[in-house]
């Protein structure tokens, strides 16, 4: 069998026009189409690459859905997590459902959700 490294080096040294001619020549001799072979793996690879990205979410949003009976404790929790002023925190709690914090990690979202649940609020992690 021919030395594959030598063949690879020769192909690497081809110009774009020569590479195109080589592809056409191989298509004719082997009776295949390079366009179909190239398109199929690209489509399959793209779909396979998109699926894990949808499964592994890395950024979460914590949404306050309700203040509950202990509104003052919830306002304090909002101020701790977001460093908003008293008026802004009260407006956020009164305007629920509203996002408290966006683009946080799963662990941080769980910590924030627990803090609000302990304060008497209802939260949702998206």
Curated annotation (Swiss-Prot):
GO terms for cellular component: cytoplasm; ribonucleoprotein complex; ribosome. Keywords: Ribonucleoprotein, Ribosomal protein. This is Large ribosomal subunit protein bL12. InterPro entries: Ribosomal_bL12, Ribosomal_bL12_C, Ribosomal_bL12_C/ClpS-like, Ribosomal_bL12_oligo, Ribosomal_bL12_oligo_N_sf. GO terms for molecular function: mRNA binding; structural constituent of ribosome. GO terms for biological process: translation. Homodimer. Part of the ribosomal stalk of the 50S ribosomal subunit. Forms a multimeric L10(L12)X complex, where L10 forms an elongated spine to which 2 to 4 L12 dimers bind in a sequential fashion. Binds GTP-bound translation factors. Forms part of the ribosomal stalk which helps the ribosome interact with GTP-bound translation factors. Is thus essential for accurate translation. SUPFAM superfamilies: ClpS-like, Ribosomal protein L7/12, oligomerisation (N-terminal) domain. It comes from Solibacter usitatus (strain Ellin6076). It holds the Pfam family Ribosomal_L12. Belongs to the bacterial ribosomal protein bL12 family.
